[in-house]
């Protein structure tokens, strides 16, 4: 819950900056550069990168038969607000994709939550700072010799879906296709519903449906034309969305397909059932398995098209 996180942020803000500066040398070896974990059918390796002066914690997932002298398609996965890359892992996306032959990079947005390992306080995070983070991550991933530069994909959950869509609109030549999971295309509308005008947004902190956020978070999306902006991306997009999502209504994804992603290769996949809510992968195994199957099949098609 973002509201609970911001309360904790206030209590810990004095010490957090000093701790962030030493994250890579933390007492927790599991977040140290190069820390390796063997998973079923793949290997996870901690790999930090930077956005300017900010340290970004991330992990590569490599296929079981990974050979650094070869090149692999890559998926960069972005989490939602108040979440972390560990939640993306819990949803099984990185593991399944690596088992399918992809190199995957997941990371914690700077200020994306109180539980993340990257720099920046939660109250200083905005959709646009996350967009800058994702672009920096893309640049970092593209420096790896084993990354197939012609097959870079983005996957984003919730706010990470919106951030991925905005980033792809700016860097459409770098992104072959996108997989968006219940993308938070509602955020600008939420801001306008909460405040009658941008002048009504309070200083320091503000309220959104997800809870208390920094005022800049609301200000930076208040006048955002979401669909007009994301429509600059002309590649294929698959959106997967639960029909019982109350936080980000399904209708927002319907509108995205109707107004922004109008190409023949773009599609909206509904997830049905009582558990098809926001974040359905966490408690709806059948829905998660179906989403991952159709999602990876969608990406696989874009590999075969150019072989």
Language-model segments: which ranges?
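N-terminal cap/lid segment of alpha/beta-hydrolase-fold proteins
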Residues: 28-69
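The serine-hydrolase catalytic nucleophile loop
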Residues: 83-94
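Short alpha-helix in the alpha/beta-hydrolase fold that links the catalytic acid
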Residues: 90, 249-259
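Conserved alpha/beta-hydrolase
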Residues: 97-116
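Alpha/beta-hydrolase active-site loop
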Residues: 123-145
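Hydrolase active-site cap/lid region
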Residues: 166-213
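Short beta-strand/loop motif that positions the catalytic acidic residue
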Residues: 233, 239-241, 245
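C-terminal catalytic histidine-bearing segment of alpha/beta-hydrolase fold enzymes
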Residues: 263-307
């Amino acid at each position: 819950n973002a509201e609970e996180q911001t309360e904790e942020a206030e209590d810990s803000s004095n010490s957090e900056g000093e701790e962030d500066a030493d994250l890579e040398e933390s007492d927790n070896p599991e977040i140290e550069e190069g820390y390796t974990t063997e998973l079923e059918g793949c290997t996870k390796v901690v790999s930090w990168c930077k956005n300017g002066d900010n340290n970004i914690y991330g992990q590569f997932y490599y296929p079981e038969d990974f050979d650094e002298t070869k090149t692999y398609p890559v998926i960069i996965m972005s989490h939602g607000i108040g979440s972390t890359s560990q939640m993306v892992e819990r949803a099984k996306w990185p593991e399944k994709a690596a088992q399918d032959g992809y190199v995957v990079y997941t990371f914690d947005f700077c200020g994306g939550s109180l539980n993340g390992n990257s720099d920046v306080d939660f109250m200083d995070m905005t959709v646009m700072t996350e967009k800058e983070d994702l672009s920096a991550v893309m640049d970092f991933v593209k420096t790896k010799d084993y990354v197939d530069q012609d097959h870079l994909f983005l996957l984003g959950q919730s706010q990470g879906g919106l951030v991925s869509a905005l980033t792809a609109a700016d860097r459409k030549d770098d992104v072959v296709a996108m997989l968006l999971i219940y993308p938070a295309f509602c955020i600008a509308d939420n801001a306008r519903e909460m405040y009658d005008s941008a002048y009504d947004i309070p200083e320091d902190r503000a309220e959104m449906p997800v809870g208390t956020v920094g005022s800049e978070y609301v200000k930076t999306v208040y006048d955002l034309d979401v669909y007009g902006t994301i429509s600059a991306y002309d590649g294929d997009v698959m959106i997967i969305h639960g029909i019982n999502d109350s936080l980000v209504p399904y209708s927002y994804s319907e509108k995205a397909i109707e107004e922004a992603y109008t190409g023949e290769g773009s599609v909206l996949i509904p997830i049905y059932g009582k558990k098809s809510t926001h974040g359905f992968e966490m408690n709806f195994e059948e829905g998660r398995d179906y989403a991952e199957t159709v999602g990876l099949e969608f990406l696989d098609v874009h590999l075969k098209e150019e072989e």
